[in-house]
């Protein structure tokens, strides 16, 4: 494998995802080729700013960009209108125009909010993703979904806006605490369940720490193909929500104290057990998924009762009227979209919890 990999995502417009070491130090020159001359506002949270903001801003300035930056409080609890409004006011005060750009430097929360700010400001300006976590690298930085949370639930206000570029600096993964790295492992394992044995067996045979760049590349290639076929999530792309209906409910029930990846892992395990117990999945698939999650430091269940989870899930964006679409794992590489009445969600979750 070469030291730097480039994957093209053929959406409208198309863009490139670049994966390799040292990309933040070189981000100015790489983005200059994509953006030309413009002003860049870097959005970053209070955890990531001390680690990488100075490096990124220096690289951008060296490439001739005018640069400003906004630091907001870290954490899912701040992924809300208050923070979004503050970012938008900063963009206006900094006099960004429609030819300028927002750079999302950080994890999934930063990418979601900075992207939504870019989609909203002046009815849409360009943005780039500079993911610093495994979760944002393998999943949320690609595909153009942007959002904030509402009191009723997660990611309920947002927009689709494809980034102009994504630079995944694998050096950033070295600074991640084990729990944060595991967060990203959950989304990678989810992708393995969706894509098939080739990718999933990689996670069964060894932990993701063995070859993170290759894991990122494989996950992005799979997701890019899905997004290209269904950019606005009308069909196949909904399968990427595997584990997320219950996962988002777990996050909400915890007041977002449980991080996204850990919640998705638990949601995936619950849905796999439910699918097998209800006769939808081949025997043994839920045990394989649970073992893989455990090997990568992730939970395989939740203490929240089925009633609380079902109630929280009814605010999920995948609900439509009196029905909700769930993603059912039938085998590794075979997942089905199943539209069910909302009244059936509780017994399905209960089956997945062994109740």
Language model features with spans:
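Short glycine/serine/threonine-rich phosphate/pyrophosphate-binding segments
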Residues: 109-116, 137, 249
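ATP/NTP phosphate-donor binding region
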Residues: 2-101
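C-terminal charged capping/lid subdomain of soluble metabolic enzymes
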Residues: 2-4, 186-189, 280-355
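Non-catalytic interfacial helical region
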Residues: 88-105, 114-129
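Residue-level signal for inorganic ion chemistry
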Residues: 20, 42, 80, 131, ...
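A glycine/threonine-rich phosphate-anchoring loop and its flanking beta-alpha core
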Residues: 116-206
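Active-site segments that bind and position negatively charged phosphate/pyrophosphate groups
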Residues: 201-308
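Glycine-rich beta-strand-to-loop/alpha-helix junction loops that act as flexible
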Residues: 74-75, 105-107, 242-243
